[in-house]
Amino acid sequence: MLFIAISLGFFVENYREVLVDRQKEKEIIASFINDLETDIKELDIVIQRRETREIRIDSIIYILNNGLQDDYGKDLYYYARYLPRPAVFWANNTTNEELKYSGNFILIKNQKIIDTLLQYNDNFIFIDFIKEREEYLVRRLFDQINVLFDPMVFDEMNVYDIEFVYPSGNPKINTKNKDVINLFLSNLHYVKTVNVGQLGHFKKHQKKAKEILNFIKEEYPDVAAEKRK
């Protein structure tokens, strides 16, 4: 009888630990779902702004290539003022980082989920690399912006927000020197190229996030159902 009682005690304790681990696993999965949903929403905003940036860059190139800067000075200044401000994606990978450092990935019993999430997290490394490359190209472009554009016009365009307003009148650029303009366009080309690359990568990343989110919800329908309540 004593043996049975001891065995039963071990069984109850082990069962309790299983329940606790299962609850922790569900909490981790719910946290991952939150991270992915946040990423998807954030990427919606970033993608839209990147598409707008592409239009602005193409407009600048068209205006300057066709010698229309005197006709579209207001637009030129407005588009140029946004060049140093590419939309940045900040990945919400808090849960992934916490699990890597705590070793609690072991609580997730589904190995496919673990592999998928780790692969998703690896994409952030590439995103950060491209972000650094873009920052370098934008810094190079600053020198030409300072030569071509009147800082007092830019100052007029400031508002108490992260956005800008169109300048009044039809301001002119500082020079019509072709060498100066071509140098600006050359550097702008590289900024455009990295923006196109970023835009494509963000779209792929968002698609992957949606696929992973659906996969997790299929594998953990109870967690998904609980979140919908």
What feature does the model see in each segment?
Residues 1-19:
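Membrane-embedded hydrophobic alpha-helical segments
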Residues 14-229:
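Long, hydrophobic alpha-helical segments that serve as membrane-spanning/inserting helices
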